[in-house]
């Protein structure tokens, strides 16, 4: 099972930033992340914990994307590219600056026979 880790470490207004990392072929990859509330998900942060991740078809994006499952009182939470709050409805957005790492992650999830899991950790500094 592929393990993905998200460490949330910085707040700026309502936005929450972090670093998403995963290992592939003994090499660590990292991506900057961004989460922002929306009208549909005012209580938007996924609680810290471990969640299964499946690659499923997204009708909104019209392609396969990672879907985080078993989030309490939430559904449809995905990991996808984005740079502004309007790109998210409570999802984990990946910074486009890390485009090659995003492609590696998505390709790896696509080619995995097993699903992945994500560990979400909070390490905010005062």
Where are these regions (language model features)?
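Cell wall/extracellular polymer interaction/catalysis modules
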Residues: 1-116, 121-126
């Amino acid at each position: 099972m592929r393990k993905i880790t998200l460490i949330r470490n910085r707040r700026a207004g309502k936005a929450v930033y972090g670093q998403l990392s995963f290992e592939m072929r003994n090499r660590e990859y990292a991506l900057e992340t961004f989460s922002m509330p929306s009208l549909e998900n005012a209580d938007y942060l996924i609680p810290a914990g471990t969640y299964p991740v499946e690659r499923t078809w997204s009708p909104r994006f019209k392609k396969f994307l990672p879907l985080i499952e078993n989030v309490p009182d939430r559904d449809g939470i995905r990991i996808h590219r984005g740079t502004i709050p309007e790109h998210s409805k409570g999802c984990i957005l990946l910074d486009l600056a890390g485009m090659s790492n995003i492609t590696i992650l998505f390709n790896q999830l696509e080619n995995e026979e097993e699903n992945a899991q994500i560990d979400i950790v909070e390490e905010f500094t005062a």
